[in-house]
Every structure is written in structure tokens, then in C-alpha cells.
Amino acid sequence: MSLQLFGHPFSSYTWKVLIALWADETPFKFRMVGPDHPENGDELRRRWPFGQFPLLVDSDQSVVEATCIIEHVQAHHPGPNRWIPDGELGRRVRFLDRVFDLRVMANMQAVMFDALRPAEHRNPADRSIARERLRTAYGWLEANLDQSPWAIGEQFTLADRAVAPSLFYADWVEEIDEGYPQLNAYRARLLAHPLVARAVDEARAYRPLFPLGAPDRD
């Protein structure tokens, strides 16, 4: 049975996995989750009752969480790229992966999910806190990211795949202004990467779904 990936082209965590699969030219069947494909949503919830994606099916095994999926594929279907290096570099990659998911992505999503609520249930205070935390993350990244092309140097790793969708959408929620020149330059390099550009283009048709309104850029 070939690999099956349940997800959506507009989903940041789906991007994270897609970029790795595309880069390694790993064969897989994409099963889009959405109103036009109810059978995929049903199968996703059967395998993972929380209904969250991405989810990878490998024979009779279901693997959830984007980072876990990438580690599973690297272990069982290795390609030419080493997404998590060994040793100290690998620990740095895992640390940055957590920073990008928990400090950038999570706060971006907090603002976005609040916008999806009915107006009477929205919480401006929570949105303000999440935006402030995004600015804190921007400041930390500006000061601590490697000055090389990618997060840990010359090698494009799991950390870069985590930050590409994180910074892409975070900038839509809380713009990364001119006060963060290194971070803006890094975001631009990420968006110029062919596989990140592919993810952006394949998601372009779904921009009307963004609850805050997609800006006229990128």
C-alpha cells in the first residue's frame, strides 16, 4: 500500500510534510480533507478521532503530527535529504522546530481561530496577547537565527520546513515590519525556495478562506 497523506493545501502543518515528500520525491497519494471530499474526513476521524491533519497512513499504521510524520518517513522511506542531522545540529533543529511551532504558529493560530468564532464570542484580550507573543518571537528570531541561508547553516532542514508556513501566515496576522530585517530576509529566502513556492501556489486558490482576509502580497 502506498503512503497516503490526509491534509489540505492551505494548512500550514500539511505544507510542512508536503515539502519533505516533494523534496525526496517520495510517492504518496494526497487525500484532501474538506467539504468536497467527505469520505476523506470520515476516514481521517476513524483513524484519529480528533480530526486534525496532517495524518499519514503507511500500510496499516497511522502517523499523526507533522514532525512525527517527517521522522517516520525519514526512518522508513528515506530519501536523499537528511531532515534532522545527527548530534548537536540535530538537537538545534529539533529545538527550532519547537520554537517555530509553539511560539510562532500557535500564536498565529490563536488570532486566526478567534476570528472564526461568532462575533459575540471573540476575545480581543486574547488576540492582543497572541500578537504580543508573536512580536516577542520575531525579536528572538531576529537576534538568534543563524545568518546563513537557512536556520542552521547551508542545509535546508526540518527547522526550515517548520518556519516556512509559520512565518508565511504569521506575517499575515502580525506583519513582520522593517524592524526585523534579518527575519524579513529569511522569510523572503524561504518563499523563493522552489518547494515552498510550490506550496504557496497550490494554496493560492484557498486564500478567501483566511478569516482575517489575506493581504495582497506573497
Q: What do the predicted segments below correspond to?
A:
Residues 203-218:
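Acidic/histidine-enriched, glycine/proline-rich intrinsically disordered or flexible terminal extensions
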Residues 100-195:
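GST-like fold's C-terminal all-alpha helical module
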Residues 86, 198-206:
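Short, flexible loop/turn segments with low-complexity composition
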Residues 1-128:
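GST-like domain detector, emphasizing the conserved glutathione-binding G-site
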Residues 74, 166-167, 200:
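Active-site-flanking alpha-helical
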Residues 45-46, 94, 146, 184, ...:
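Alpha-helix boundary recognition
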Residues 64, 88, 178-182, 198:
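Alpha-helix N-cap and coil->helix boundary residues
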Residues 34, 158, 203-204:
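Short, solvent-exposed turn/loop segments enriched in Gly/Ser/Thr/Pro and often Arg
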